[in-house]
Amino acid sequence: MRAVYLTPSSTFPTEFPSNTLFGAICTGLSDLGYDVDGLISRYPEDPPFILSSTFPYVTAGGRIHHFLPCPLLPPLDVRREEDFDNAKRFKRVRYLHEDVFRDLAGGDLRLADLIAGLGDYAIDRGMLARESKTPVLERDEVEIPHNRINRLSSESEAFYHTYGSMIRNGGYYFLIRFYDTAWEPPVRAALRFLEDRGVGPKTSGGQGQFSLTFGDIAIQERP
């Protein structure tokens, strides 16, 4: 499966769901002169491509560490008190390191065993990895100062609005699969267009800037 990496170079949106990402790509395609209405009309019966939301990745030790959302798993029957505490901790996990995800999705690791041995895993900022030395995404939320006028006193008042984050050791990626390969060059062109312009609601102020790279990733899929 194709992976598209967005490495932020300025304040970047904290989350980028698939519908927002698809809309941004369609905007880029439209600005480049492609038939977006014709593209969208194919989706009920014959989708040209599908894509995921963005997920975090970390660059460390000469490799890219992908993190993926927790797969949907059957409810766990927790009986031991220590497992109950671990299950509560696990509920706060949003992303799994790709190695853990593959083991869970492939059936090599049972959820019950993961919960029972949760103390052997590293959990930081909602990201779970098998080893404590595995880095997690280092990001700091950014507060943007604004001014507003008090209508009663006509005085200027400062307030702060949290927007996105600054990332130091990675970025975000999303997965995309083309069923109609004729659309791959246009989508790549639209992504390059977005790379030049930026993404998100604050691009005019220099936010949402990123560099773009393409790659491949093997994901365990259901038969």
Task: Indicate residue ranges for each PLM-predicted region.
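Conserved active-site/ligand-binding neighborhood in enzyme cores
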Residues: 1-223
